[in-house]
Amino acid sequence: DKIGTIDYESEKVLLDIIAEKYDALADTEDPKMRAHLQQIINDLSVRAAEYVIPNEFDRLISRFGGTKLNAGTSYDYTLYFNTFSPQYISQWAEINSERLVNPVFRLFQSELETVYEEKNMYGDTMASVAIEKLTERYFYPHPYAYPIIGSAENLKNPRLSEMRRFFEKYYVASNMGLILSGDFDTEEVLPILESTFSRIRKGKPPHRDIVALPPFEGREKVSVRIPMPFVKIMALGFRGV
């Protein structure tokens, strides 16, 4: 809440209302009501954007020699990474720990559109459709059956409140790790990391249920229609040991 805004208190009032409207949007299937709520969300988002300092985090990282700022998500982890000049370790640690203490989910609407674009980009390829269906059946009822980027239905009904609950559950120190590589003095760096990243909530590591995969009942087939005539694709999956 200290990075990316000129007035967080005023911005937060609007962001809280936006979160409530997203919950209401997810709770209704009425087309007229959904259109009405989407218009309200859009109007509020425009007002909230007036308090935003675009890309301030990126610029701060770059100011201190940082490059290749990016993030990635897989089935079991989310990672954030970039390179930076070692003489700026103090600034780097301050900036990166700050965003994990109390993140603000601003510009959610535009970020959601970016996710939609990525979903559609991969969904238009033949292999992606086949592999997604194979993975869905192969791992059911394990969470791996669910696509990493989310389902189309889920993306149509996003909830900022769920994002906040996810953060509070999983973004605790006991469930996180920090990896540094390069030319630096460990004895000099450790006190800096302890004074900055120790601000992250301790918390208990989230409980994870072990989901046993039921055996296949002989040979199973899943048919998938792809929007390309005269093209056939096949994917096979086998359980290992």
Predicted regions and their residues:
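Extracytoplasmic/secreted cell-surface and envelope-processing proteins
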Residues: T186-L190
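M16/insulysin-pitrilysin zinc metalloprotease superfamily fold
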Residues: K2-Y8, R47, N82-L112
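Alpha-helical scaffold elements adjacent to nucleotide-binding pockets in ATP/GTP-utilizing enzyme cores
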Residues: I95, I192-T196
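Non-catalytic beta-strand/loop surface segments
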Residues: T5-Q87, M121-N175, S195, R199-V241
